[in-house]
């Protein structure tokens, strides 16, 4: 369980920021037997084989377009994680307008384009499962406030969450409860403990990919050089992630 004590949605600010859970099953020596939400050295979420999971690579080598780009591949909001190729990511994802003459964007627009990090290209919201703060008002009360300001119900609805299913945590606010189901036959050793950590990324890998592949010019070249020469080893942001909370190893009962 995660409790949000920051007083607003988390992460907040620009929409490409994200937080994610790393959940590990450990043996008696502290070695990882199974993990969801592990990363590589550039901050991409990977599976047990070290392969980036769905939604981590928005662009391919030499800025080629991946086969799953048109389908807006991403990690959905989970209430139960059952595989190392799944990860709980708290984030907002938006998409571009579809490639046709007549397009309706904004409130209730259906995602049809590709995922984007450009504020100028936003047409529809794909996902918003950012953690709600304690005391987040339910929709009827948000509508009352919107009307008092002279705004419509759209404002109240758009300030909620998107694509979280029937998760009760997003009706009450305050955090998220999540279950990890680990098949015993997926473990190569004897499990002794589990550990959960919450990480934050202000600059996820896909944001940099999108900048480098969709923008040209000296500013982009400068950013590419800076990020390519940035040495985070041994820093609090090693592997392009910042630790927010850590449960420490929790022993598994008999």
Language-model features: locations:
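Short, conserved sequence motifs used for protein processing/export or organelle targeting and
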Residues: 1-254
């Amino acid at each position: 369980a995660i409790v949000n004590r920051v007083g607003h949605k988390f992460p907040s600010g620009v929409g490409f920021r994200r937080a994610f859970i790393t959940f590990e099953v450990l043996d008696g020596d502290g070695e990882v037997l199974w993990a969801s939400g592990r990363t590589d050295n550039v901050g991409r979420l990977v599976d047990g084989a070290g392969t980036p999971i769905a939604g981590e690579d928005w662009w391919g080598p030499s800025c080629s377009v991946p086969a799953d780009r048109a389908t807006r591949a991403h990690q959905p909001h989970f209430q139960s994680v059952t595989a190392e190729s799944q990860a709980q990511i708290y984030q907002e994802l938006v998409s571009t307008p579809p490639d046709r003459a007549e397009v309706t964007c904004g409130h209730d627009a259906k995602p049809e384009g590709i995922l984007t990090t450009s504020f100028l290209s936003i047409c529809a919201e794909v996902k918003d499962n950012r953690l709600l703060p304690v005391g987040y008002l339910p929709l009827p009360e948000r509508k009352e406030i919107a009307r008092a300001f002279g705004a419509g119900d759209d404002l109240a609805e758009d300030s909620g969450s998107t694509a979280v299913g029937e998760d009760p945590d997003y009706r009450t606010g305050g955090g998220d409860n999540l279950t990890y189901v680990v098949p015993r036959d997926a473990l190569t050793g004897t499990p002794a403990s589990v550990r959960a950590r919450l990480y934050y990324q202000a600059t996820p890998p896909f944001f940099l990919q999108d900048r480098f592949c969709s923008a040209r010019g000296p500013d982009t070249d400068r950013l590419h050089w800076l990020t390519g020469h940035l040495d985070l080893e041994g820093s609090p942001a090693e592997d392009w992630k910042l630790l927010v909370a850590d449960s420490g190893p929790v022993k598994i009962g008999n």
